[in-house]
Structure formats: structure tokens, C-alpha cells
Amino acid sequence: WTYTEYKHLREMPDIEIGQRVKMGEIIARAGTTGTTGGYYGAFGHSHLHLTAFFSPVSEYKSKRIFVPVKGEWLDPLALYKGGPLKSSELKALPAAQKSVKFAYKTATGKIVPEGAKVVWPFACKPK
């Protein structure tokens, strides 16, 4: 089981934990919490904090924080690499194997590259 948690959203999405979503489906808009005031100015800047976990079982606990039973932290970059998921295994890879290419969905709905299984959680403009 793979779980992703998004923070600093403009508003809470109308979905439940464990609910399936389609790749590239808009579930929320990024907000400015965590950057408003101080160094970033009165209005802050829109950004996303992405946390990921994986677990061999589907059970989880959710009160103030989300915790998968038997879960482990997951470097979100591993999702785009296609494995391994364990941080220690990623760290042990030779430098040449640590490169990650991100798949993304454009504002018009096109998946780049075609056939990708996971996309970056922001709509992007191709270069």
C-alpha cells in the first residue's frame, strides 16, 4: 500500500483516506500556509509539502496525524523512479542510478511521457 499526504492546501479536499483517485485528478489546490508573513512577505507563496509512506498492510491510524500500520517513510522520489522504495536501498544505489525523471500532466490533460503510471502533483507546462 502506498499513501501520500499533502500539506499546505488551500482547503481540505472532499475525499476520504483510502479513496482511489485517478492519475492527474485535481483533489485540491496548493495554499500558502507555512509561508505567510516573515521572510516570504504578507502573502506567502503557494507550495506543496508531500509526504509518502508504504506498508504491506492496508490498516492505518488517523487522529491528529496519519500513521500506516507497519508503515515506513517513503522518499517521494522513489515513486517516480519505480523502486526500490526503502530509503536505505535508495541510498545504497550507485550515483548513476539515482537520477529521477518526472512524469507530469499538462494543464490540457496530456500525460508526459505517455504511459506513465505516476505524475508530479502539479500541472506543468512542457518546455
Report the location of each language-model feature.
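Short histidine-centered loop motifs in beta-beta connectors
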Residues: 2-24
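Short, flexible coil/linker segments at or flanking structured domains
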Residues: 3, 9, 36-41, 64-68
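Structural recognition of the beta-strand scaffold that forms the well-ordered cores
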Residues: 4-7, 28-29, 49-51
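A mature extracytoplasmic/lumenal domain signature
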Residues: 8-11, 34, 52-54
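Conserved protein kinase catalytic core
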Residues: 14, 35-37, 57-60
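Internal, well-ordered interaction modules that form the hydrophobic cores of assembly/scaffold domains
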Residues: 17-19, 25-29, 52-54
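Flexible, gly/ser-rich surface segments that form the specificity/activation loops bordering the active-site cleft
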Residues: 25-45
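Acidic, glycine-rich catalytic/binding loops that coordinate metals and/or anionic ligands
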Residues: 43-127
